[in-house]
């Protein structure tokens, strides 16, 4: 691609720098750059097919972000010990990049395009997701691919009341706002993040702060593109791929019919779809009779554009929506808990034609999710999985496991709920939430938030506050600035509209949000209006949820694992575990419990999980017996563990053995101890002495027996 290396630098506060370099790596790609901040380096490449597939009427764009384990000096886990398919974390970053760049390709560009972003060097303090969007955009800018960028994405966090761009990993842990913001020099395109119940004005301030950093990064990309000066590929002009005469005929013939149908306010989406489809079918039949060569591909496209225009005009001119609602009206809500009697927690949440059946399952520390990534190793005690079967929209599709959409929706709902979970010290359980979407007509991820909140309270998890979510939409005339903000959008409004803005939070504030914008001109004032309207909708939904349950249940379900905790001296941990774990494994096997032993702040913390309280209490008793301190002079029932010529070793307390000397077995002289005691025999013994140096125990049996000499006397 290039014969020389070109590099540009972006300056950040606190003497930090980002460099963008091209001309050294992957020169056969249509565009490639290396973005570096500290020791974190990303290689981004773009390639495209110049041959156009005439059957494709969309942009076949593929964005893949992958972390190389070697970047962090690690070898991947698993049997193959190599990178495989993208993990959830990589999918989420791929989606962040895709959502920001996809709107900026020209309408007439429909060539297959692939963007790969590799993490090739990893500084654990500098997070690569903050640089992935910048890398992808820079690679596009220096490539022949027509791209109406540049864009960039930055991470903005509020730490101790101050906003920081691309904070370090350690600093991020103290943030109360954590946002990824993507945009161009003029517009914000994408927002996603989590926060600690903050106010709407705080979100707007964070976005505006991020946009200033984005503008600078876009300017540097322009300088890089000017220095490379790649000749851009020209896609086929729209005039050569469009039939404007057919479009005009379709609009003139059908606009009034479609508008009248839309204004009926049909609430059932299948009936509404059928009504629009009938209009389309009848007119297409008429067109084909007049001209059998009429392009059905073009007609389908123009009819879709007609529907889109009608929806916009209906909302902008009359303040009405497809299902008859007003702009800020929320669909009818129904919810119930304890729907599944055998689950640890469950809820059924229905809003209009969107329905989520959600379960909560409580597990032990052994059920924690293993996280094995290039930059992060550890365990997660909170999981949320979102499932979207095809029948939820009345379609036939093969179930091939969770796709990118399911992973993204589940992650957003998880972020919304995790902010209200009790601290680890207050919650002993690993928590898994599963949301199965049974019906879908818009905002199923926010239905998952609502259902998840209800199910957690049903399960007895002491969340700080209930959480609700709402999806907002926007219809906007970019020429006049006239707009309509929609609350609780339908699936059609999402597809036909200009914005999808999901907001989740408590009565106190916002805990998560996600926004995708398709138009320019979204001013701070308009964003503020959308957030305030979203707040009113969220509070309304919370009110409906409170009719079902207002506080978490005070007890766990009978099917949930029973739990208790115990503190023991640090020096007794080994006694409870036993040689090679023998004692604790035996306890778990015989009581049917799971026992977790940890050292915390110089103490032993033992957690017991069992199928019922009786099992837990049984395990507790056995541990108490092990850690109990023997008392000199007390009598115990001991088991003969071994017999030696000079006596026997007797276990008089769990894990504690003492010597019963041959002279302490009987008052009479014993020649052969095997004739008096048997292995496994249970005998009463008295603790005579604990050696102050060795801690060894001295036992006696004879002192509990009558003394023949005393009897004779």
From Swiss-Prot:
Gene: pnp
Domain S1 motif residues, every copy: 633-702
Coiled-coil stretches noted in the UniProt entry, renumbered to this chain: none
EC identifiers of the protein: 2.7.7.8
Protein name: Polyribonucleotide nucleotidyltransferase
Classification via Pfam families: KH_1, PNPase, RNase_PH, RNase_PH_C, S1
InterPro entries assigned: ExoRNase_PH_dom1, ExoRNase_PH_dom2, ExoRNase_PH_dom2_sf, KH_dom, KH_dom_type_1, KH_dom_type_1_sf, NA-bd_OB-fold, PNPase
Organism: Amoebophilus asiaticus (strain 5a2)
GO annotations of cellular component type: cytosol
Lineage: Bacteria, Pseudomonadati, Bacteroidota, Cytophagia, Cytophagales
Domain of life: Bacteria
Cofactor(s) the record lists: Mg(2+)
Reactions performed catalytically: RNA(n+1) + phosphate = RNA(n) + a ribonucleoside 5'-diphosphate
Main location: cytoplasm
